[in-house]
Amino acid sequence: MSQPDPMLRPEPLESDGEDRALRPQRLEDFVGQAEARANLRVFIESARMRGKAMDHTLFHGPPGLGKTTLAQIMARELGVNFKMTSGPVLARAGDLAAILTNLEARDVLFIDEIHRMNPAVEEILYPAMEDFELDLVIGEGPAARTVRIELQPFTLVGATTRLGLLTTPLRDRFGIPTRLQFYTIEELDLIVTRGARLMGIPSEPEGTREIARRARGTPRIAGRLLRRVVDFALVEGDGRLTRKIADSALTRLGVDHLGLDTADRRYLTLMAEHYGGGPVGVETLSAALSESRDSIEEVIEPYLMQQGLVSRTPRGRMLARLGWRHLGLDAPRTQESLFDE
C-alpha cells in the first residue's frame, strides 16, 4: 500500500525545526498572502497607536501556509510577549486558566488547532475574550462557588484547518477572521530563493523555480523540498542548486511536476480505474485507500481541488478533466458531456 510521503504533507515534522532560522521575522519580509498582510499591518499599527490590545484574530486555511509565523510576527510588531499552545493540550479548564492568568497586558496568546479544544475549556474562553474576565468554579457539589478573576487585556490568535468545526459562539468572538490561501509559484520561488541564500547555497533561477512548482502551493513543503535538493546538490552535484539537480532529486523522491506523490496519484488512479471518475463518496475512498476521512479531506484533497484535478459535488467526488489528463487517460463519454455543459 502506498503511504503518503511525510515530506509532501503540510503538517509539521520534527525536522521542520531547521526551518525556524529561515522564517521571516517581520511583516515586510513575509512573502505571499498580500491581502491578509495589508490588513494586518493596519490592525497592528492601529493597536500600537491606541496602546490597546489588538482584536482577537482567527487564521484559517490549509496547513503549512504560515499561521504560526504570522502570529509570531504580530507579537513581535506589537512589541509584546508571545505564548503558544494548542487545542488538544488544553484538556481542562485549569490548563487554560493557568495560561490566561499569567498573560501580561496586550500579550498574544496563540492556540493552534483551536477547533479541537475541549468544549468545557471553550466555555471559559468566552468571557475571557469578551470582557477579559475568567469565571472559575471552586469546589464541588453544594459547596461549589464561582470566582471571577480579572485578566489583563490580551489578543487571542486562533488557527484552524477546519473552520466548519468551530462553534458559532467561538467563531463570532474573533473580530479579525483571516483566510490564508495557497501560494503562487512566483511567491514560493521567492521563498525558496531566500531560503537557499540563508543556507549559503548558490542557486540558479530555474533551480529554485523547479522546487517552487512542485511545492503544492505550501511554504512548509517548499522548505522541506529545498533541504532535500540541497542534499543532492552537495553529494551528487557541485553544490549549486540548478534545474537539473532539482528535477533529478525531486523525481527520485517521487514528486511529479505538479507536486503530487504516490498517495495523491493512487487517489486519482483509484477514482479513474475503479469508479469511472465518480461520483464516489469520501467514506468509500477512505476505505479503499485505507486513509482516515480527515486525512483525505484535510491533506490530500485541498491541493487536488485547488489544481482542478478533482471536484466535489453533492453526490460525491469526481475526477475532473485535468485529473484524467494528468493520468494520461481519456475521460468516459458520460463525463465528457458533463464537462462540456
From Swiss-Prot:
Species in which this protein is naturally found:
Paracoccus denitrificans (strain Pd 1222)
Q: Could you identify this protein by its name?
A: Holliday junction branch migration complex subunit RuvB
Spans annotated as Head domain (RuvB-H): 257-341
Q: Which reaction does it catalyse?
A: ATP + H2O = ADP + phosphate + H(+)
Q: What are the recorded GO MF terms, alphabetically? A: ATP binding; ATP hydrolysis activity; four-way junction DNA binding; four-way junction helicase activity
List the keywords (alphabetical): ATP-binding, Cytoplasm, DNA damage, DNA recombination, DNA repair, DNA-binding, Hydrolase, Nucleotide-binding
- EC assignment: the record states 3.6.4.-
Q: Which NCBIfam families match?
A: PRK00080.1, ruvB
Q: State the InterPro entries in the record.
A: AAA+_ATPase (IPR003593), AAA_lid_4 (IPR041445), DNA_helicase_Holl-junc_RuvB (IPR004605), P-loop_NTPase (IPR027417), RuvB-like_N (IPR008824), RuvB_C (IPR008823), WH-like_DNA-bd_sf (IPR036388), WH_DNA-bd_sf (IPR036390)
GO terms for cellular component: cytoplasm; Holliday junction resolvase complex
Binding-site positions, Mg(2+): 68
Top enzyme class of this protein?
Answer: hydrolase
One GO biological-process annotation of the entry reads: DNA recombination
Binding residue positions for ATP: 22-23, 64, 67-69, 130-132, 173, 183, 220
Share what the entry says about its subunit structure, partners included. Homohexamer. Forms an RuvA(8)-RuvB(12)-Holliday junction (HJ) complex. HJ DNA is sandwiched between 2 RuvA tetramers; dsDNA enters through RuvA and exits via RuvB. An RuvB hexamer assembles on each DNA strand where it exits the tetramer. Each RuvB hexamer is contacted by two RuvA subunits (via domain III) on 2 adjacent RuvB subunits; this complex drives branch migration. In the full resolvosome a probable DNA-RuvA(4)-RuvB(12)-RuvC(2) complex forms which resolves the HJ.
Which compartments is it annotated to reside in? Cytoplasm
Region: Small ATPAse domain (RuvB-S), residue numbers: 184-254
What is the recorded function of this protein according to its Swiss-Prot or TrEMBL entry? The RuvA-RuvB-RuvC complex processes Holliday junction (HJ) DNA during genetic recombination and DNA repair, while the RuvA-RuvB complex plays an important role in the rescue of blocked DNA replication forks via replication fork reversal (RFR). RuvA specifically binds to HJ cruciform DNA, conferring on it an open structure. The RuvB hexamer acts as an ATP-dependent pump, pulling dsDNA into and through the RuvAB complex. RuvB forms 2 homohexamers on either side of HJ DNA bound by 1 or 2 RuvA tetramers; 4 subunits per hexamer contact DNA at a time.
Which residue ranges does the record annotate as region Large ATPase domain (RuvB-L)? Answer: 4-183
